[in-house]
């Protein structure tokens, strides 16, 4: 397909037909298990505080907002879905568009399809089993292997990620020819993520999916800290064929602790000369009201379809990638 034919779809129609069938499979998977399908807003007055996520921002001008109401396109439906959980929805799932003002390329598009679901009274391990069931059904792959973050990082990078200081992480980055990228980072977690992405991820999940669990507590985000080891969080990620597919948590339900994490993120943002982000007070109010103990996971549907079709890049399975949108 020539670049001059930019009106045409990025993906072959045959792939879009197969994609539609896979999305139908996903819906049946959850409806057969009794989960409620929901739709939540694509925009919000609040957004994520995570220093590694960049949301799109717009402004609503209308009744009651003549001066302009800042709105953010959602990077995931998580906050609204948790409000539904607190309101008594029970187990629920959603297939929706999410938006991140970041990369575009082989595995990224600023607008993408997210599958997210939440299971009240599931722990992290039980939810990992359900993710594994879904991957086996859609990808016709073997059951996943499970590895702790500490185990897989130590094996491939050569140092313990839970005890290494910034200097040791920088030295490891130099050893792996990542010194230039590491030299501009002053945040320990960013160095950990650099080493994990560049050294660990390429070496796991080749023949079958790999679940990595118990990420460092400093990367807990919205996850509970493990009761087994306070150095780690009850968080997991799923990888296959060198691609990150899913990110799941045993969800934090303590509103006070969640506020502290949001505020800590914003302090980091200020230190990095990034803009502070508005905290989602509605989410915190829902947590304070009482969200059931649960686990939840977000999965990239475009990447899942790409793997199912053995496609080379996301644009092979998206009707119109960003360069043709």
UniProtKB/Swiss-Prot annotation:
Molecular function per GO: acid-ammonia (or amide) ligase activity; ATP binding; lysine-tRNA ligase activity; tRNA binding
Enzyme kind, highest EC tier: ligase
Superkingdom of origin: Bacteria
Quaternary structure annotation from Swiss-Prot or TrEMBL: Homodimer.
Cross-referenced Gene3D superfamilies: Bira Bifunctional Protein, Domain 2 (3.30.930.10)
Family of this protein: Belongs to the class-II aminoacyl-tRNA synthetase family. EpmA subfamily.
Annotated organism of origin: Sodalis glossinidius (strain morsitans)
Residues that hold ATP according to the record: 100-102, 109, 244-245, 300
Task performed by this protein: With EpmB is involved in the beta-lysylation step of the post-translational modification of translation elongation factor P (EF-P). Catalyzes the ATP-dependent activation of (R)-beta-lysine produced by EpmB, forming a lysyl-adenylate, from which the beta-lysyl moiety is then transferred to the epsilon-amino group of a conserved specific lysine residue in EF-P.
Reaction equation(s) it catalyzes: D-beta-lysine + L-lysyl-[protein] + ATP = N(6)-((3R)-3,6-diaminohexanoyl)-L-lysyl-[protein] + AMP + diphosphate + H(+)
Keywords: ATP-binding, Ligase, Nucleotide-binding
HAMAP family in UniProt: EF_P_modif_A
UniProt-recorded name of the protein: Elongation factor P--(R)-beta-lysine ligase
Enzyme Commission number(s) from the entry: 6.3.2.-
Highest classification ranks of the organism: Bacteria, Pseudomonadati, Pseudomonadota, Gammaproteobacteria, Enterobacterales
A Pfam family this chain is assigned to: tRNA-synt_2
Gene Ontology BP terms: lysyl-tRNA aminoacylation
Binding positions (substrate): 76-78, 118, 251
A cellular component term, taken from the record's GO annotations: cytosol
């Amino acid at each position: 397909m020539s670049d001059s034919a930019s009106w045409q779809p990025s993906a072959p129609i045959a792939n879009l037909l197969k994609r539609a069938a896979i999305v139908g499979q996903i819906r049946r998977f959850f409806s057969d298990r009794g989960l409620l399908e929901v739709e939540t807003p694509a925009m919000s007055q609040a957004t994520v505080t995570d220093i590694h996520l960049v949301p799109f921002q717009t402004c609503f001008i209308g009744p009651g907002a003549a001066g302009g109401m800042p709105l953010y396109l959602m990077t995931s439906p998580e906050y609204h879905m948790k409000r539904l959980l607190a309101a008594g929805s029970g187990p629920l799932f959603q297939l929706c568009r999410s938006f991140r003002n970041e990369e575009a390329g082989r595995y990224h598009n600023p607008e993408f399809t997210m599958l997210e679901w939440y299971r009240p009274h599931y722990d992290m391990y039980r939810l990992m089993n359900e993710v594994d069931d879904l991957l086996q059904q859609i990808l016709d792959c073997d059951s996943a292997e499970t590895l702790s973050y500490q185990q897989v990082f130590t094996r491939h990078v050569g140092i313990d990620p839970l005890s290494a200081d910034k200097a040791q992480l920088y030295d490891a980055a130099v050893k792996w020819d990542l010194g230039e990228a590491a030299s501009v980072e002053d945040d320990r977690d960013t160095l950990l993520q650099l080493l994990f992405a560049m050294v660990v991820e390429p070496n796991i999940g080749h023949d079958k999916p790999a679940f990595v669990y118990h990420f460092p507590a400093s990367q807990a985000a919205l996850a509970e800290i493990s009761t087994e080891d306070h150095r780690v969080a009850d968080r997991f990620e799923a990888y296959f064929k060198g691609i990150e597919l899913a990110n799941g948590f045993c969800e934090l339900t303590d509103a006070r602790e969640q506020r502290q994490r949001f505020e800590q993120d914003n302090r980091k943002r200020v230190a990095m000369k990034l803009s502070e982000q508005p905290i989602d007070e509605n989410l915190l109010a829902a947590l304070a009201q009482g969200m059931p103990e649960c686990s939840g996971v977000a999965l990239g549907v475009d990447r899942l379809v790409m793997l199912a079709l053995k496609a080379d890049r996301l644009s092979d399975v998206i009707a119109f990638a960003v360069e043709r949108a």
